[in-house]
Swiss-Prot record:
Phylogenetic lineage: Bacteria, Pseudomonadati, Pseudomonadota, Gammaproteobacteria, Enterobacterales
SUPFAM superfamilies reported in the protein's UniProt record: Transmembrane di-heme cytochromes
Co-factor binding comment: Binds 2 heme b (iron-protoporphyrin IX) groups per molecule.
Membrane topology term: Multi-pass membrane protein
One Pfam family linked to the record: Ni_hydr_CYTB
Family stated for the protein in its record: Belongs to the cytochrome b561 family.
Residues given in the record as heme b 1 binding sites: H13, H151
Protein's name according to its UniProt entry: Probable superoxide oxidase CybB
Top-rank lineage group of the source organism: Bacteria
Regions that span the bilayer: 7-27, 44-64, 85-105, 137-157
E.C. no: 1.10.3.17
GO biological process annotation, one example: respiratory electron transport chain
Length: 176
């Protein structure tokens, strides 16, 4: 049994975090950018969202191949249960958010760009559905900030208070 997650799992974990930060920054800060930059910032947001979806699906498939390394010392069953619930909430959020985002853009019936490519859209716009989906997208996005914060806080609690290897299992190897 390995003491750490695989390099691939660690890489995906931190890459998803980076993409979430870029997606959030590009959409939240677009109002501060010159008007000519706004389509570019939206494209970054859309591209990051699609990349997050692909990486999260990949991460779930990899999870089936590589067992979760044990936490040492072993935490209580309640803590393990809460961790499992927290991880599945994160997986669901970061799969649902991009899917809903893609559905919003599709329903608007106008061209949108991801990765520099024109993406498909509905021939007939359905703005009511797009607006409803956008409300869910915003709600889930705001929930995700809270969940990410709890996830980071739990990792720090494990490291500094419980003094187990939870955080170390997901850290890249030291060079040297």
């Amino acid at each position: 049994m390995h003491k750490k997650y695989s390099c691939l799992q660690i890489g995906i974990h931190w890459l998803v975090l980076l993409l979430v930060i870029i997606a959030w920054s590009s959409i939240e800060l677009r109002g501060f950018a010159p008007r000519s930059y706004q389509p570019w910032m939206k494209m970054i947001h859309f591209s990051c969202g699609i990349a997050i979806l692909v990486l999260m699906m990949t991460r779930i498939l990899i999870q089936l191949r590589y067992p979760t390394p044990p936490i040492v010392p072993k935490p209580s069953p309640m803590i393990v249960g809460l961790a499992h619930v927290g991880h599945w909430v994160i997986y669901l959020l970061f799969i649902a958010l991009p899917i809903i985002g893609i559905a919003i853009l599709y329903c608007r019936g106008s061209s949108w760009i991801a990765f520099g490519l024109i993406m498909p859209h509905a021939e007939q716009a359905n703005f009511d559905l797009a607006d409803t989906l956008k409300a869910y997208h915003l709600l889930l996005a705001n929930m995700s900030y809270f969940v990410i914060g709890l996830h980071a806080l739990a990792a720090l609690l494990h490291h500094y208070v419980l003094k187990d290897n939870t955080l170390l299992r997901m850290m890249p190897k030291k060079r040297g």
